[in-house]
Amino acid sequence: VKILRFERKDEAVAWAKKIIGIDGMSGDVTAISLLDDKGEFLAVTVFSAYTGTNIDMHIAARPKSHWLSRSFFNASFELPFRVLEVPRVTGLIRAENLNAQRFVSRLGFQYEGRMRKAFPDGGDLMLYGLLREEYLKHPWSENETTRGTTRSQGDISSDRVPP
């Protein structure tokens, strides 16, 4: 397993769009990828719509794969919180994608709202946010106060999904 930071970006973004099922992402786009032993994508975190105070984050993973690790978690949050030093990241998820909503909630994202009819097909978009200080306090964060702690994915946060 190998983490790529920005290499194969175009290929990674195209793969993530196919997995997530979305066409466009606004602004400059970059990606951090996790590859299997054959060099194929296991997971990709795509970043878009950087404003100086926020960046959108999209996470795509190969279905039925075991890809989430502390190292990929920290690699994914390194760009927004340690390099760009934005105060927040935003996760945008289709309303019907309950698995993704549960997943980001477990990562510590907070539900922030619903954009009705945000997609061309009339579908709603759910907004989730994670603040820099929430990431730094996260049990998996590579932060001097939490380094060395572990927690299973299911215990990271609640499974609450908003209406």
Show which residues each predicted segment covers:
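C-terminal "cap" of GNAT-fold acetyltransferases
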Residues: 118-163
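Acetyl-CoA-dependent GNAT
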Residues: 6-54, 63-64
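A conserved beta-turn-beta hairpin within the catalytic core of GNAT-like acetyltransferases
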Residues: 48-59, 85-87, 124
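Conserved GNAT acetyl-CoA-binding A-motif
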Residues: 82-93
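A short, internal acetyl-CoA/4′-phosphopantetheine-binding micro-motif in the GNAT/acyltransferase core
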Residues: 58-68, 94
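Conserved acetyl-CoA pyrophosphate-binding loop and the N-cap/start of the following alpha-helix
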Residues: 68-76
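Conserved active-site alpha-helix within GNAT-family acetyltransferase domains
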Residues: 96-113
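Conserved catalytic-core motifs of GNAT/GCN5-like acyltransferases
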Residues: 92, 110-125
